[in-house]
Amino acid sequence: MYEYLTGLVTVVAPQYIVVDVNGVGYKLLVANPYRYQEDRTKKVQVYVYQAVREDNISLFGFTDQNEKNLFMQLINVSGIGPKSALAILANPDHQGLVDAITNNNVSYLTKFPGIGKKTASQIVLDLRDKLTNESSSSLFATTQLTVDATVNRELKDALEALAALGYKERDIKKVQKALMKEEQMATDEYLRQALRLLN
């Protein structure tokens, strides 16, 4: 069982990254791959969960132990598999997720893909008492980003990646204005351009 991998990110794709560890490339399914786009010349440490099925072995990656712990809590809920849990964690507001669970906010949880009212209620039932004060603390705090509805999906994903990287909303808004003047690009191209503007 892997705990974490340390290496260089060599591939950033819409649903996964590849981390090169001593010449071996590990494909990791992650919640927001574009957060790893910022500097691919430095080694990163990615926490790992290995999911084993009869026909498939998958590795899921996390930025830190807290994100992994939240993932592990989610997959223990009936009806939530690893990919569903990862889709929930794709929202960078992990504090909001924890608050929704502890405050019995079922409607908040139903906004995630594939999560209906029944599953959302099950998440609250199973996890409300298990989430400790430590897991629901500011460790999950992140930039809250409101993106204009007119922004295309690729740019929206890039802006959310900037928020996940820790950039302030005012800086992201400045970059958004500049990028909206450009022709439409892929998410990774938007992100590269945004990082150039920010740096």
UniProtKB/Swiss-Prot annotation:
Top-rank taxon, per record: Bacteria
Entry's Gene Ontology cellular component terms: cytoplasm; Holliday junction helicase complex; Holliday junction resolvase complex
Region Flexible linker: start-end pairs: 143-149
GO MF annotation terms: ATP binding; four-way junction DNA binding; four-way junction helicase activity
InterPro entries: DNA_helicase_Holl-junc_RuvA_I, Hlx-hairpin-Hlx_DNA-bd_motif, NA-bd_OB-fold, RuvA, RuvA_2-like, RuvA_C, RuvA_C_sf
Known role: The RuvA-RuvB-RuvC complex processes Holliday junction (HJ) DNA during genetic recombination and DNA repair, while the RuvA-RuvB complex plays an important role in the rescue of blocked DNA replication forks via replication fork reversal (RFR). RuvA specifically binds to HJ cruciform DNA, conferring on it an open structure. The RuvB hexamer acts as an ATP-dependent pump, pulling dsDNA into and through the RuvAB complex. HJ branch migration allows RuvC to scan DNA until it finds its consensus sequence, where it cleaves and resolves the cruciform DNA.
HAMAP family reported in the protein's UniProt record: DNA_HJ_migration_RuvA (MF_00031)
Protein name as catalogued: Holliday junction branch migration complex subunit RuvA
Organism this protein belongs to: Limosilactobacillus reuteri (strain DSM 20016) (Lactobacillus reuteri)
Lineage: Bacteria, Bacillati, Bacillota, Bacilli, Lactobacillales
Gene label: ruvA
